[in-house]
């Protein structure tokens, strides 16, 4: 009887490992391309209407939301701008007070934030409230590595 229980436990463990591995593989985030028109350097100011339209059309893009009245000791916008220029990509920008009128505000509650959006859905974003993201705001290479975990460059 003990032997049967041991065999059943081993089988359940093996099946669990197989299932978890399978779901881990499926849930793995695949890199994606931005829309073609975002593979040229620009820090393009957009309105909340533009963002809502891009979401509705299920577009893929990078969005920077910022507070125009906030000045930081470390000029994060220069980090983002330098990266965009070096990699020849466009980052859309919107003031946070306008950003609040988008659907994305339900998820991203703080500025300064960079949001990676694929097919109209937020994949990830820099959270200004999390200590783990501070280095990404301060270093072009670290910011670039973070972006390139999700986005394929041309």
Language-model features: locations:
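Local sequence-structure signature of Cys/Sec-based thiol-disulfide redox active-site neighborhoods
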Residues: 47-86
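Thiol-based oxidoreductase modules, predominantly thioredoxin-like and allied folds used
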Residues: 65-67, 88-102
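Short acidic, S/G/P-rich loop/turn micro-motifs used as interaction or catalytic elements
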Residues: 68-72, 99, 123, 130-132
């Amino acid at each position: 009887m003990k032997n049967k229980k041991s065999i059943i436990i081993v089988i359940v463990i093996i099946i669990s490992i197989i299932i978890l591995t399978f779901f881990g593989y499926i849930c793995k985030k695949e890199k994606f391309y931005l829309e073609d028109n975002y593979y040229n350097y620009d820090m393009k100011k957009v309105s909340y209407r533009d963002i809502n339209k891009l979401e509705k059309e299920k577009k893929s893009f990078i969005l920077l939301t910022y507070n125009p009245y906030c000045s930081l000791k470390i000029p994060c916008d220069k980090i983002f701008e330098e990266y965009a220029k070096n990699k020849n990509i466009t980052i859309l920008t919107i003031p946070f007070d306008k950003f609040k009128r988008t659907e994305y505000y339900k998820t991203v509650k703080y500025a300064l934030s960079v949001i990676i959006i694929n097919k109209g859905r937020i994949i990830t974003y820099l959270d200004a409230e999390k200590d783990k993201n501070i280095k990404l705001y301060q270093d072009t290479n670290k910011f670039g590595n973070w972006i390139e975990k999700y986005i394929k460059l041309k």
